[in-house]
Amino acid sequence: MALGWYELKLAKDGQFMFNLKAANSQVILTSELYRSRSAAENGIASVQKNGLDEKNFEVRVAKNDKPYFVLKAKNHQEIGRSQYYSSSVSAKKGIVSVTKNAASTVIKDLTNEA
């Protein structure tokens, strides 16, 4: 089975962020903003490590009543979060997708495309 990949990007304010994409190109996890490239790369490494275990995920419900999930490191710090889903079942399928794709070592550097 083909794995997804990470896309490292520059945000509009010059900070770094990344998305984890599934093999079908769908974004399945979005990071927080990082002040440096190395911090964002460390975030990717944390997803590669912590994203393999479903125990590190937490399903939440947004103010608009849409479920989403967050991935947390062992220190309980949030590493990334999902999009909003139509149901908790869909959010849980998203978690399974992250666990299947988190180990990817493919990082597409899009920081020069901003």
UniProtKB/Swiss-Prot annotation:
Classification via Pfam families: DUF1508 (PF07411)
Keyword vocabulary terms for this entry: Repeat
Organism phylogeny: Bacteria, Pseudomonadati, Pseudomonadota, Gammaproteobacteria, Pasteurellales
Protein source organism: Pasteurella multocida (strain Pm70)
Keyword Repeat belongs to the record: yes
InterPro entries (alphabetical): DUF1508 (IPR010879), UPF0339_domain (IPR051141), YegP-like_sf (IPR036913)
Gene3D superfamilies: 2.30.29.80
Signal peptide extent: none
Protein name per UniProt: UPF0339 protein PM0519
Keyword Transmembrane: no
Sequence repeat start and end residues: 11-59, 62-110
Similarity comment: Belongs to the UPF0339 family. Duplicated subfamily.
